[in-house]
Design a protein with these regions (language model features):
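Bacterial N-terminal signal peptides that target proteins for export
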Residues: 2-11
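Histidine- and/or cysteine-centered catalytic micro-motif in compact active-site loops
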Residues: 5-6, 225-229, 286-289, 387-389, ...
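A generic structural signal for short, solvent-exposed coil/turn residues
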Residues: 7, 16, 44, 66, ...
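Bacterial N-terminal signal peptides
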Residues: 11-19
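Boundary at the C-terminal end of the N-terminal hydrophobic targeting segment
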Residues: 22-24
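A structural signal for small-residue-enriched, beta-sheet-centric alpha/beta enzyme cores
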Residues: 26-119, 123, 134-365
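Short Gly/Thr/Asp-enriched flexible loops that form oxyanion-binding sites at enzyme active sites
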Residues: 124-129
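Peripheral terminal and inter-domain segments
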Residues: 366-462
Length: 462
């Protein structure tokens, strides 16, 4: 029976309501930068690799603004469920985690939301809450208030050339697109534009990962958005993705990076400076009945285990958060202890971490440089605007092309301090040599596309 204390706590959760926007399942129309946040159209349940699993209690929706790119992942449950949270790292961004730490033995969580956009993306969590109200699942009555919890990751900075963020429109698109038994691993949802390995200068593409396991009647699902300061490693200690420095081994191991810190292990293995705002946000779901204390320990145990798959983990530059949910559909099996359940769940979470790693953009290799006419070179020259903060000036000189950033900050390998020579790579496509990919595609008239592909950034010629 619900206590008076828990009833009063529910009353304190009432929020102001907003209008639900019209949604579209069709691809977003082509917009020209600089993009207006108001004009962006959500694209739902796309990207990544599909993972199917059998658990009717869970519905998952994902939405993105491809122009960012940035996105949201919404996990909603068939009824209110019991939740717990474990917050680590030096810079978390959360909604309603304090309430979960009150340990009320009452199932109250409707949804867990993960979002890009740093603290601006916290709007996604409250947007899901109002969507619960707007669709009639929840109401304004004191014992039927919706409760969405969630966290954000930092996906701004040098990984993209704009500051588009997930908003109410995007989050509610993900909410209404939620479907049973489907999760997308890799560059999708809140993991649409994540990175790993800034700690070592790896700057690798990352994403979101999911995994599922059933042991008898017990179901365990793990979901994580990996935007870690550290690197992702498999069970043998092999680093899964890294743009290595000169002289680094091809099969890079965690021990190669972690030993002898802070000094580099080998000559030339310096650790470059970089942004120190990273976060891994995760969710472990079990169908076993648990009380609040047991669920809290599950969150702590699984969260602690993640330091095996991400190294280093929970640093001052991370804002790591772990949610744990019990759907309470089955009793505890005979012989299954809480530490055993935590051990199994920890392995499922490691699988989810590994599933988050997408195929990496390859570094361009010039084998036979194409001939570029003087006419084409002059046509490519001009001022290109990616956003209000990033522009690039392309100039022609002596039959060659050069580029220099003219906005507030650099554009990948193109800096504000000096012109970079653009090396012909393919017809209409050029590159800037360096540790990380910097590819410039001029094949679309009046536009410049940098690093073409799923993380591409587009500018228009002024």
């Amino acid at each position: 029976m619900m206590t008076m204390k828990s009833r009063l706590s529910l009353m304190a959760l009432a929020f102001a309501l907003g209008a639900m926007p019209a949604l579209s399942q069709t691809p977003a129309p082509k917009l020209n930068p600089p993009y207006s946040q108001a004009d962006l159209k959500p694209v739902v349940n796309t990207g990544g690799e599909v993972m199917n699993f059998d658990w009717p209690m869970l519905k998952i929706g994902m939405a993105e603004y491809s122009e960012g790119p940035t996105g949201v992942t919404v996990i909603r449950f068939g009824r209110k469920v019991l939740g717990a949270v474990d917050v680590r790292g030096g810079g978390p961004g959360t909604v309603n985690t304090e309430y979960l730490d009150l340990f009320y033995n009452v199932p109250e969580v409707d949804s867990v939301v993960f979002s890009g956009g740093s603290w601006y993306g916290l709007e996604s969590v409250t947007a899901v809450n109002t969507a619960l109200k707007d669709e009639g699942t929840r109401s304004g009555h004191w014992d039927n208030i919706g409760l969405a919890v969630g966290s954000i990751i930092y996906d701004f900075g040098d990984r993209r050339l704009n500051e588009i963020y997930p908003d109410k429109k995007l989050a509610q698109a993900a909410f209404h697109a939620a479907e049973t038994g489907v999760f997308r691993n890799g560059s999708a949802g809140a993991g649409r534009n994540t990175r790993t390995g800034y700690y070592f200068g790896c700057n690798s593409a990352s994403g979101q990962g999911g995994a599922f396991k059933q042991v008898g009647d017990i179901k365990i699902a793990a979901f994580t958005v990996v935007n870690a300061f550290g690197v992702v490693a498999d069970r043998d200690g092999k680093v899964q993705a890294c743009y290595g420095g000169e002289g680094w081994p091809k099969d890079l191991m965690v021990k190669d990076l972690m030993q002898n810190l802070p000094d580099s292990q080998k000559p030339g293995w310096t650790v470059p400076g970089g942004p120190k705002r990273n976060t891994t946000v995760s969710l472990i779901v079990v169908n076993q009945k648990m009380d609040p204390a047991e669920l809290k320990r599950l969150a702590v145990q699984v969260h602690t285990s993640m330091a095996r798959g991400i190294q280093p983990y929970a640093t001052m530059g991370d804002g790591d958060v772990m949610y744990a949910i019990s759907t309470a559909e089955v009793d505890t099996p005979e012989g299954m202890t809480n530490p055993q359940l935590g051990g199994i769940a920890s392995e499922v979470m490691w699988d989810a971490i590994l599933n988050s790693v997408p195929e990496q953009p390859s570094l361009p290799v010039v084998t036979s440089a194409p001939q570029v006419t003087e006419k084409a070179i002059k046509a490519y020259a001009g001022d290109y605007r990616f956003s209000n903060i990033v522009s690039v000036k392309v100039t022609a000189d002596g039959g060659k092309l050069y580029a220099q950033a003219t906005g507030e900050r650099r554009a990948y390998g193109i800096t504000k301090e000096a012109k970079a020579e653009l090396i012909p790579y393919k017809d209409g496509v050029f590159m800037v040599p360096g540790r990380y990919p910097t590819v410039l595609d001029f094949t679309t008239k009046g536009k410049l596309v940098m690093n073409p592909g799923q993380w591409q950034q587009t500018a228009v010629k002024k």
